[in-house]
Design a protein with these regions (language model features):
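Tandem repeat protein-protein interaction scaffolds
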Residues: 2-10, 14, 21
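Eukaryotic scaffolding regions of large macromolecular assemblies
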Residues: 8, 19-22, 27, 32-309
């Protein structure tokens, strides 16, 4: 694994081929140990994660099957003790899942949710994705779980929405405008059939400050609003259900509670970190300046010595 830190892409690719050959013959226990060690290396070397993390994960998916790699990574990260790293890693995995060509088959499977296996895969990813609120929201939009996405968005009202979260919402708006979410944009043509999708996008609009992403999303929703004046004959109206909340085999309420619990843990960590950061300058000032009592004692002792003299 140390070779993965080599600056040469060719060396990294050769090393990955060797690692994948070893892992292809390993049982699930040793495969999990390998991915755990890989995550620990990413946690210790953030530069490696930023520079080569996406390439390494995508190559593992190509050679070891995405359906094997991603669920195990999700299981490990779900209970990861370093919450900050877990959130960063989930954000990276989400971008790989959404945008990488290598993960197109996995996207098809979790979009379908038509078999128990696909539903269990979604649940495993979602429980891990809860470490990063915007990634969890993106996963819901990707799987067309619009009612759940709206419920997730409502939980944001109880959270401290940080600048980092707003920047991630900005990126999510850009993703919605990309080819990956073409089906989502086309579903906006049927707002009566996908009311929670419309409400979710309006909720994102309310989160965003006045910015280019705000203008992009507002323009998209204004175009949808104009459809409200159109009507269709009853016999031509599509008879579709309100997307994913009607899938009974997925424990939606349990997942929502899990998301809330994990996000509250992250919020407590952020608040504790902010308090430490705020107190650090005060400690430095106190270390530089003598305490008032010490100055008084010094003055008093000096006065006593003068009187004796």
């Amino acid at each position: 694994l140390r070779v993965l830190s080599d600056p040469s892409e060719e060396v990294i690719l050769c090393d990955l081929r060797l690692l994948t050959q070893i892992c292809s013959r390993a049982d699930e226990h040793h495969f999990r140990l390998f991915l755990t060690d890989l995550l620990e290396r990413f946690a210790a070397d953030r530069r490696l994660l930023e520079s080569w993390g996406s390439l390494i994960i995508r190559q593992l998916c190509v050679h070891l099957q995405t359906e094997r790699v991603f669920p195990v990574l999700a299981d490990i990260l779900e209970t990861y003790e370093d919450l900050e790293f877990a959130s960063i890693m989930v954000q990276n995995l989400n971008m790989i899942l959404v945008a990488s060509q290598e993960l197109k088959p996995l996207r098809r499977r979790i979009r379908a949710l038509d078999t128990r296996e696909h539903q269990q895969l979604f649940v495993r990813l979602y429980r891990c994705w809860s470490h990063n609120a915007i990634s969890a929201l993106c996963l819901c939009l990707l799987t067309q779980s619009y009612e759940h996405a709206y419920n997730v968005l409502r939980i944001f009202a109880d959270l401290d929405v940080s600048l980092s979260m707003l920047l991630q919402v900005d990126k999510l708006v850009q993703l919605i405008e990309s080819p990956i979410f073409t089906s989502l944009r086309l579903q906006l043509l049927e707002p009566e059939q996908h009311p929670f999708l419309v409400k979710c996008l309006y909720g994102m609009l309310m989160l965003l400050p006045q910015s280019s992403a705000f203008a992009t999303l507002r323009n998209r929703l204004q175009a949808v609003h104009g459809l409200g004046h159109l009507t269709m004959p009853n016999d031509e109206r599509p008879h579709t259900r309100y997307a994913r909340q009607a899938t009974p085999d997925v424990p939606w309420n349990e997942l929502l509670q899990h998301f809330r619990t994990v996000q509250l843990r992250h919020e407590r960590l952020r608040l504790a970190t902010e308090r430490l950061t705020d107190n650090e300058p005060r400690r430095r000032v106190q270390q530089r300046e003598p305490a008032p009592f010490a100055r008084m004692s010094f003055t008093a002792n000096a006065g006593t010595r003068s009187a004796r003299e």
